[in-house]
Amino acid sequence: MIEGISFASFVTHEKPKFVRALDFYKALGFLPTKEYKHGTDHHATDEEGAGSIQEVWLTSSRAGVPSVTVKLRLSRHGNEHVSLPNLKHDWRSLVPSLVYYAPDLDAVRAAITPFLHEDHSTLLERPSHTNFIELYAIDPMGNLVGFSRRENPYSSAMQKPFSADDIGPQNFSKPNETKIKGKKRIGVMTSGGDAPGMCAAVRAVVRAGIARGCEVYAVREGYEGLVKGGDLIEPLSWEDVRGWLSLGGTLIGTARCKEFREREGRLAGALNMVKNGIDALIVIGGDGSLTGADLFREEWPSLIEELVTNGSITAEQAERHRHLDICGMVGSIDNDMATTDVTIGAYSSLDRICELVDFIDATAQSHSRAFVVEVMGRHCGWLALMAGTATGADYIFIPEAAPDATQWAEKMTRVVKRHRSQGKRKTVVIVAEGAIDSDLNPITAKMVKDVLDGIGLDTRISTLGHVQRGGPPVAADRVLASLQGVEAIDAILSLTPETPSPMIALNENKITRKPLVESVALTKKVADAIGNKDFAEAMRLRNPEFVEQLQGFLLTNSADKDRPQEPAKDPLRVAIVCTGAPAGGMNAAIRSAVLYGLARGHQMFAIHNGWSGLVKNGDDAVRELTWLEVEPLCQKGGCEIGTNRSLPECDLGMIAYHFQRQRFDGLIVIGGFEAFRALNQLDDARHAYPALRIPMVGIPATISNNVPGTDYSLGADTCLNSLVQYCDVLKTSASATRLRLFVVEVQGGNSGYIATVAGLITGAYVVYTPESGINLRLLQHDISYLKDTFAHQADVNRTGKLLLRNERSSNVFTTDVITGIINEEAKGSFDARTAIPGHVQQGGHPSPTDRVRAQRFAIKAVQFIEEHHGSKNNADHCVILGVRGSKFKYTSVSHLYAHKTEHGARRPKHSYWHAIGDIANMLVGRKAPPLPETLNDEIEKNIAKEQGIIDPC
């Protein structure tokens, strides 16, 4: 059962421990091969301990695998093993450990369970007790023994990477198993319209393919390159795609090819693939490109037969290329593909639109003008809807929600006039290029301008055009492209002739595979439904998030300072307070909560400057929020009502007094881990203070993304975008000076989320997190890796490199210390510099993703208060509103606090994102780091050598 390369000697002077340890290792599958007792005729050899009362040697081995030998010694003077003072935390580094390879950890756990303490405190499963790849236990003699699915934890060989299918909440299990039959040649192409993130996708495909033992060929200029062949089809090496992660567009070119639509063109493409030995194709493009790819696969057998018949290829070549494997990745800024929540390029395009509309706002505000902004989206209004939400547009026109042909102008002018009457100086209307009315007549930007001119507004048209496609991809697109690229390779390697062509999708925050043909067919159904005036069906075919976002936009847009548009049964008084460090999206959440509350007839109050502000300033810290003051907040960073790290424990009695005095019916707390703690303190105080027995809901907002009960927090995406821009500039500088490494310190507290994801999207060569820690052996391993990498890239471009270190990954190995050690060890072969972005990571303007999420969070929070107001079941009245996949979930704070939180580390016990680090390492070629080893390990080894005890190497 166990494989390894170690020889270990364990000593004790207690006979019961010796006997129980013997049973322990026998249960693991070790067999006694040698036994020695003092006083028998047998004489101890040099290998055997002369001072032993009894020795038993146990060995476990398999054919072709080096044996593992454990020598148990009963001695008059056994070693005293280090005690473990606190078994509630990760105690692996407190004593020396011996780690074995064990492919079946469930069997190992079952075998050693009878030897554990009743509370299982001597067992540690990592990274979690449900999904573990390492298992540590304390044997009866007090030795720490580990078991790992990794074949050799101390080896420098690259461990098998995790599949991208493992990335996603509640989906962290075994890596996707692929069957590689021979060395496969895989072609990759980009086709149709370009999209930001395509280069990152190609990079991931190339490097994942090489890591999986494949050869990857670029088919340049899309299907045109496939038809023409020659130099347009060429192999890509690992180094060829260096630096592509941050580039916009596609460096392998794209084109729309009429020839490929005809069979003769596809026949030429088949011939060129056979000539180059390519038997699989990954196509990155829109629905038209993917449709062509699947047709190509469907016709492949007949194309090969025709090529044999006309003598273009031999029968032997035909036999080697009997089947063609196709995999699709959707690259489209419109986000118009069914069965996936988002497509590569959509987030970046949305970011461009929102940035430009933010700029337009300044001039519109100055001149009190109206602007009509036309964005892309021929059959899909995703860009227009999300941009309208993120920028606080007055009105939007999208194809799926076509307005009445005779009333749309009147409805729009009514909304615009209402907003102007409430004091708003600017008007922004966003029009999708495919916008139509209920009679399928186009609604153009010019038509909207004419209507606005008719009510006396000075109106301008801004058509954004191809600016929406340009620029580097944002953080979300880099993550999506990288994970989907890895999954595309795995999909290709696991396909059979009977398997339908897959399309790589994102569903519920999981990378998934969907049937390509069905996905394209559903996409076309949306256009058909719109063409048939069945707009309800068109909306049904969109994902639920799209529908919910549209409803949220309409509700917040209908807010009126004087008259509620959708009055609730019971008007409520709702308080909003921010706690902890500022994060992008806080203001957007405040805005959406207030606008939704006003639309429902509620009174919305801000508690300024957190809990300490309420205690110190009393009624002066509480102020009712108006429509006009919150309306422009969606674009602003920071926190307009003030925030700090004070908690209710500063004076619970005074806080309860003011809650009672203000007659609050509900509370929304926006913030990070401090908000979580604040809610727990308020929840615990309910029994003493009746004024606190109201519905309370927490909206997670922190760049650390460390709030239990949610996969995402507001501000994390803004932080990642800030880091992407910062690190891209650093890499440019490092590349210009050639052999330079920047050691970048990132925030995140005790959560490695930001460092891990930033490592993936910036192409960092090394990432250190609090979860993995830093030690001398690991640092030595990584410095050696960096030296080798720089040596191989001394004369090439784009050689700038990054090392990311979370601010709390080590108290000893600080950013400056690591930089100094690297410079000393590099001996002038390269140099290292320190870069600390600090609070720049909190970002300026929040990202569109954080703005859009903020609206959904805020509306759900107010709805929770509406639903639970007046209920007597206080147990479920205090919750964290979290995102699981793409769905929102309310979770009791008391449950999270008691069962799901590492309080000392201020983070959840389980997180979905850990496997991203393995994929990031694979994509930069970082070899598997050694297991952590403390200085105590080195001391123990030296003592063992002096005593003649053979210690595992």
Swiss-Prot record:
InterPro entries: 6-Pfructokinase_euk, ATP_PFK, Glyas_Bleomycin-R_OHBP_Dase, Pfk_N, Phosphofructokinase_CS, Phosphofructokinase_dom, PKF_sf. Pathway: Carbohydrate degradation; glycolysis; D-glyceraldehyde 3-phosphate and glycerone phosphate from D-glucose: step 3/4. Residues 573-953 are annotated as: C-terminal regulatory PFK domain 2. It comes from the Eukaryota. Beta-D-fructose 2,6-bisphosphate binds at residues 645, 702-706, 740, 747-749, 807, 833, 839-842, 906. One of its GO terms (cellular component) is 6-phosphofructokinase complex. One of its GO terms (biological process) is fructose 6-phosphate metabolic process. SUPFAM superfamilies: Phosphofructokinase. Substrate binds at S332, I333, D334, R369, M376, G377, R378, E433, R460, H466, V467, Q468, R469. Residues 559-572 are annotated as: Interdomain linker. Heterooctamer of 4 alpha and 4 beta chains. Keywords: Allosteric enzyme, ATP-binding, Cytoplasm, Glycolysis, Kinase, Magnesium, Metal-binding, Nucleotide-binding, Transferase. Its cofactor is Mg(2+). ATP binds at G193, R256, C257, G286, D287, G288, S289. The active site is at D334. Catalyzes the phosphorylation of D-fructose 6-phosphate to fructose 1,6-bisphosphate by ATP, the first committing step of glycolysis. It catalyses: beta-D-fructose 6-phosphate + ATP = beta-D-fructose 1,6-bisphosphate + ADP + H(+). This is ATP-dependent 6-phosphofructokinase. It comes from Yarrowia lipolytica (strain CLIB 122 / E 150) (Yeast). Its EC number is 2.7.1.11. The gene is PFK1. Allosterically activated by ADP, AMP, or fructose 2,6-bisphosphate, and allosterically inhibited by ATP or citrate. Belongs to the phosphofructokinase type A (PFKA) family. ATP-dependent PFK group I subfamily. Eukaryotic two domain clade 'E' sub-subfamily.
